[in-house]
Amino acid sequence: MAQITASMVKELREKTGAGMMDCKKVLSEADGNIEKAVELLREKGLAGAEKKAGRLASEGIVETYIHGGKIASLVEINSETDFVAKNEEFKNFAKDIAMQVVASNPKYVSREEVPAEEVEKEKEVLIHQALNENDGKNIPEDKAKMIAEKKVEGRINKFYSQICLLEQPFIKDPNKTVEQLLTDLIAKIGENIKIRRFARFEVGEGLEKKNEDFAEEVKKQMGQ
């Protein structure tokens, strides 16, 4: 299989306007063949999705989800037109995102919203963990640090996938992320759609209480 480089992904994005992860995926499927990758993106309806994402989305809806009267979410999903905001697929997407917030408890919509100090703090923890893993392996200090930093590059993505809504595995189909679900909807509907913000509420949150995993209940319910 051909090695997929950053320059290949960049070239495909410039040709099609598709998202970075989608470009990387189809390049792998096309074994590095740019033209074949372009065809695959068009077949999947993903070409041009990112260009649509640059347009202003100021209409939309606020959706709610309440689980057993104990845990709830509010999400604002924006579209370019009121017509799309009334579309059943758009409304179903909003409902799915409201349930996703309840079940997976993200803190931010995207990694761009995560405060730099929070990221640095997490990186410090991960570096210490990685260095501890090298203890007793008789590795020179400078090389041990280099190995630790490489490990952190991969592990920080897992950190983002836990706290950022767009990077979380979609609760109904863990093989795709919420961002991929959103990109698919943009391509299908033909308008820019944004998950603007959300709020999550849980009875007794912040208070001492018995351990009840409502989020796990929601996941089980959505998997049925």
From Swiss-Prot:
Chief location bin: cytoplasm
Q: Which InterPro entries match?
A: EF-Ts_dimer_sf, Transl_elong_EFTs/EF1B, Transl_elong_EFTs/EF1B_dimer, Transl_elong_Ts_CS, UBA-like_sf
Question: What protein name applies here?
Answer: Elongation factor Ts
- A molecular function (GO) term: translation elongation factor activity
- Say what the protein does: Associates with the EF-Tu.GDP complex and induces the exchange of GDP to GTP. It remains bound to the aminoacyl-tRNA.EF-Tu.GTP complex up to the GTP hydrolysis stage on the ribosome.
| GO cellular component term, pick one | cytoplasm
Assigned keywords, A-Z: Cytoplasm, Elongation factor, Protein biosynthesis
List, alphabetically, the SUPFAM superfamilies matched: Elongation factor Ts (EF-Ts), dimerisation domain, UBA-like
Positions of region (Involved in Mg(2+) ion dislocation from EF-Tu):
81-84
CDD domains in UniProt: UBA_EF-Ts (cd14275)
Its family remark reads: Belongs to the EF-Ts family.
Q: Where is this protein found?
A: Cytoplasm
